[in-house]
Amino acid sequence: NHMRFHSFCPPEAAFAAADRVGFYLQPEGPSWPNHGSSLGNGEPIDDYLWAEAERMVKAYGNHPSFCMMAIGNEPRGNWVEWVSKFVDYWKEHDTRRVYTGASVGGGWQWQPKSQYHVKAGARGLEWARQQPNSMDDFSDNRFILQAGTTPYVSHETGQWCGFPHFNERRK
């Protein structure tokens, strides 16, 4: 019952619907700053994301479904220091939700200030290292073990191609 919004914040209707049915939402700042930009290097995106986070919380912060927050997806640059400041700020200024700096793949650094981690590699879904399978031991996963006691949310595990057979549906 958790839904992550990859690099964006959904509209009011998503929060209202999630409040009604009991979904937990993780909106993110509109950022995937490893394609032409980066965090923590003094670029305009640094200030933009701070302001956008403030706008998100002001607009939707009272929705009970808005219980998790990240600033974006897979950053580069001096991002660990930048997202650590982001998490520290929000932990101090708004305790209504839990915070992680950014949602990241398995090769990205750990974010020491995050209250939970969104990281790839859970359940044997390590993309290039092994094929998806049902024999993975979740409790023996190297990423889970590295997270320690901090909660761990699997990153992008639902990104699998699906090719429907349209002749199977009723007309």
Language-model features and meaning:
Residues 2-171:
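Substrate-binding/catalytic cleft of secreted carbohydrate-active enzymes
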